[in-house]
Amino acid sequence: MDFLFYFLFKLIIQSTTKMPPRDPFNSMLSLGYSMLFNEIMSNVLALGLHPYVGFMHRIAKGHPALVSDLIEEWRAPLIDSMVLAMVKRNMLTKDMFETNETGCFLNPEARKIYLQTYNKKLRSDNQYFEDKYTYRESIRQQCRKYASVIMHSDITLYEPLELR
């Protein structure tokens, strides 16, 4: 339980940090967001979409703005909820993180636990609109809906994510 209070204290006192992560909680979030980013990037590329042209994030050299746009609705239901559950269940301890001048990172043992948890979460079912899909399938479906909007110039083909 000490680990939970440590993380919640850090979460309340400090805002989330970007790269590099400076504490265990942000390290877990950062790793999850990076993995989710790659999951969405592979779907965007598989659909033949241009990952660097988005609609919410500013277009910047070398930044896949579309992927950043599409990741937003998945952060809380996937990564944030998973990390909070891991903290609540004390799945990782403070000594499973390595902190140095470049940031705070999961050690190999922690990465193994984290990756297993992440993959289990992506394989778990959720209520995606009218059907049940795994999170991985739901991400694929949402990317397809976005592609349909682009191909048919019809915004009504895309529904914002609402998981129940």
Where are these regions (language model features)?
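Active-site helix-to-loop segments that bind/position phosphate- or nucleotide-bearing substrates
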Residues: 1-164
